[in-house]
């Protein structure tokens, strides 16, 4: 059973780096072409104030993913390590297929008329609910319950890695990005991650 003190207890450096790398990579790849990345582009184009938008993305992701990872830990109490391993494999395979499906926002009306920080925080937090990056965070939390804080740090950094450049180049149109090719490459990487998890 998960012991909540493990959130802050030190882990071996090698394990921490492994969890951090997997968390960053998984979420950064899953975020490519995702609706929250498109939301970042929309927010940047609308407000043209990158600092409050990036701060809002950071805090919204931290809050959302902390909750998601904790829920994953709760589920992990009822699953064996072998089952968790194959849940992770299946999740990577699912991501490989999911990433190939173009995502879109529900509409600009979902963006608040408040200031850039408040509007970005609310919009980003709500957009993450049920999103594939949130689901991935829950699964990672279940798999690496002994290093939960590093899962949260890694998934948050992964979101920033994928979204900060989009905010900074918000003047560019998403139509000019080779999203089709990017999605295919990303799907291939998720497939490799699934194979590596299953057999190594």
Curated annotation (Swiss-Prot):
Membrane-related topology note: Multi-pass membrane protein
Gene Ontology molecular function, alphabetical: metal ion transmembrane transporter activity
GO cellular component terms listed in the entry, alphabetical order: plasma membrane
Induction: Induced by manganese.
UniProt keywords, alphabetically: Cell inner membrane, Cell membrane, Ion transport, Manganese, Membrane, Transmembrane, Transmembrane helix, Transport
Subcellular location, principal: membrane
Transmembrane segment boundaries: 13-33, 53-73, 81-101, 110-130, 150-170, 180-200
Localization per record: Cell inner membrane
One Pfam family from the record: GDT1
Phenotype when the gene is knocked out: Mutant exhibits sensitivity to manganese but not to other cations. Under high-manganese conditions, the mutant accumulates high levels of intracellular manganese with a concomitant decrease in intracellular iron levels. Mutant also shows a small, but significant, increase in resistance to oxidative stress induced by hydrogen peroxide.
The UniProt record lists the keyword Transmembrane helix: yes
PANTHER family, alphabetized: TRANSMEMBRANE PROTEIN 165, TRANSMEMBRANE PROTEIN HTP-1 RELATED
Family affiliation: Belongs to the GDT1 family.
Miscellaneous comment in the UniProt entry for this protein: Expression of mneA suppresses the manganese sensitivity of an E.coli mntP mutant.
Role according to the record: Involved in manganese homeostasis. May function as a manganese exporter.
Name of the molecule in the record: Putative manganese exporter
Lineage of producing organism: Bacteria, Pseudomonadati, Pseudomonadota, Gammaproteobacteria, Vibrionales
């Amino acid at each position: 059973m998960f012991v909540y003190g493990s959130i802050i207890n030190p882990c071996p450096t090698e394990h921490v780096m492994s969890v951090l790398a997997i968390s960053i990579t998984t979420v950064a790849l899953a975020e490519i072409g995702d609706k929250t990345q498109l939301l970042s582009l929309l927010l940047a184009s609308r407000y043209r104030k990158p600092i409050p938008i990036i701060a809002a993305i950071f805090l919204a992701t931290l809050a959302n993913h902390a909750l998601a990872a904790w829920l994953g830990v709760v589920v992990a109490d009822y699953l064996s390590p072998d089952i968790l391993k194959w849940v992770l494999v299946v999740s990577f395979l699912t991501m490989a297929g999911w990433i190939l499906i173009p995502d879109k926002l529900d509409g600009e009306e979902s963006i608040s008329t408040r200031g850039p920080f408040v509007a970005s925080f609310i919009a980003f937090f709500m957009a993450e609910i049920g999103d594939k990056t949130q689901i991935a965070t829950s699964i990672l939390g279940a798999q690496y319950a002994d290093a939960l804080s590093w899962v949260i740090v890694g998934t948050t950094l992964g979101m920033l890695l994928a979204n900060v450049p989009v905010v900074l180049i918000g003047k560019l149109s998403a139509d000019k990005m080779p999203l089709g090719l990017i999605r295919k490459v990303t799907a291939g990487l998720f497939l490799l991650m699934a194979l590596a998890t299953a057999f190594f």
